[in-house]
Amino acid sequence: MKVLLALMFFPRGGSAQVMRYLAKNLRDNGWEPTIVAGSAPGEADATKFFDGLDVRPIDYSDALEADDPLRADPPMHPSFEDREDAPDRVFAKVDDETYEHLVAAWEEHLREAGAADADIIHLNHLTPMNEAAERACPDVPRVGHLHGTELLMLNEIAEGPPGGWDHAGEWADRMRRWAQSCERLLVLSPDAVRRVPDLLDVDPGKVVWAPNGFDPQIFDRRPKTGDERVKLWREWLVDEPRGWRPDDQDQGSVSYHEEDLAAFADDNPVLLYVGRYTEVKRIPLLIRAYARARDRFETRAPLVILGGYPGEWEGEHPLEVIQATGVEDVFLPGWRSHDDLADGLNAADVVVLPSVREQFGQVLVEGMACGLPPIAVDAHGPATIIEDGEDGWLVPADDEEAMADALIQAVNDADERRRRGDNAYESSRARYSWPALAKEVASVYDDVKAGKPESETAPGPLPDIT
C-alpha cells in the first residue's frame, strides 16, 4: 500500500524530522512512502534531508529571491509565525488571491507526486495542501497531522488577532474545515487530544495521540568526555562556527577562540538547549535564569544554545540577551544538521527546554535517549514526557527563579543528575522509539483504508496531567 507524506514547509523543524523517521519505518509495516516537501538551499535541501527516501522536492530557491515569495512559481509557503521581514509571512496576512495561487500550485505538486495513486495522503499541518488534496484527488482518504504551530496561530486568532492579520477569520475557518475533512487527526500529546476537538470543532473520535519519537540506532548513550568532548566543541565553536548576529546574519559572524574552550575542560557539566529562536521557546528567560544561577554553581557549567535557523528569530536575539546581562559561558554555535545532534547531546549532560507552549518536545526524548536528564516547563507535551523528580525536572512556565533553581541542582548534584539521566534513558526507550511508534501510525492508515469507524481508532485512557 502507498502513502504520500506531504509537507509544505522546507525541512527546518520538528515536522520534517517526524516525516523522515516515520517514512524510514513505514516499509516494515506494509506501507510504501513517498514524500513531497518544500526545499531550500543548504541545510533545508529536502533531497539531502530525506536522503535514502523517495522524495519529490519543491524548490523554493527562486521564490526566496522574488519580490513576493508567495506569488512566485512555485510559491514559497507562508508561516504560522509572524516574523518581521521574513520571506514567509504569516498565513493570517495572506489574501484570497494568493491563497488560490498556493492551492493551484499544490494541486499540481500533489498530482506530480502520484497522489491519485496513493491509498492514503498524510498531510502535515493544516495548510493549502489540504485544499489542494481535496480538489485534486477527493477520493483518496486524508490523515492530518498537527504539529502544534497551527494550533498556536489558531489560539492567537481566538484571543483576538494582532494588527495586520486582516485575513485571520478566513484562515481559521479554512483550517477547521480542513481538519473536519480528514479521516483522522494525529496529535502530539494527550493535552492536544483534549483541546483539539473544541478548537477545530471535530469529532473527538477522529483525534489520535501519536507522539514523536527517536531513532534508537542514532540516539543512544555514547558519551564524549575529556579531550573528545573538547574536540567537538572546538569544531562547532572555533573551527567551523555557524552562530550569527542579528545585525550580520551570515553563519560564522558569531565565533569563539581556543581560550573560550576552558569552560568545557575537566568534564564540566554542559547544559544544552536545541531549537529555533522563536518567542515561545523563551530562550531569553533561559539565559537570564542561567545568569542568576551561575554564581551559585560549584563548578563551571557552560550553557550552549544550539540552533536558530539563519536569519530567523522573534523578540530578543540570544546574543542581545547575553550582551545585556554580561553573562559568561553562554555559547551560540548556530544551526547544525539533525544528523549532528546525537553527537552534540553526547557532549552534554543536561538538555534544557524552557518553551511555554511545546506541543511535544522532540529534543527532550532525543536527549533522554542519550542519557541526559531534561529540564522543561510543566505544561503541554513536556509534562507528559517527564516525570518530575525521577527522570528530569519540571518547572512552572515563565518562572525564571524556578528555572535557575533547577539549573543549580542539575549542575551541583552530580549523583542526582546521573540518577535522573539513567531513568530518562530507560523511560525514553520504553515509550518513544520510532519503530514502535511507526507501527501505531501504520495501524491508523490500515483502519482508514479499511473504512473503520473513528471510534475504533480513538486512543485509550490518557495520563492525568492536570
Outline where the language-model segments fall.
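Conserved donor-binding/catalytic core segment of Leloir-type glycosyltransferases
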Residues: 4, 186, 227-281, 287-290, ...
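Short hydrophobic beta-strand element within catalytic cores of glycosyltransferases
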Residues: 373-376
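Membrane-proximal helix-turn-helix segments that form the acceptor-binding/catalytic region
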Residues: 164-185
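A conserved catalytic-core segment of Leloir-type glycosyltransferases
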Residues: 34-116
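Aromatic "clamp/platform" in nucleotide-sugar-dependent glycosyltransferases that forms part
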Residues: 356
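Nucleotide-activated donor-binding/catalytic signature segment of Leloir-type glycosyltransferases, i.e.
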Residues: 307, 315-339
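Conserved acidic donor-binding segment of nucleotide-sugar-dependent glycosyltransferases
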Residues: 388-389, 393-400, 409-414
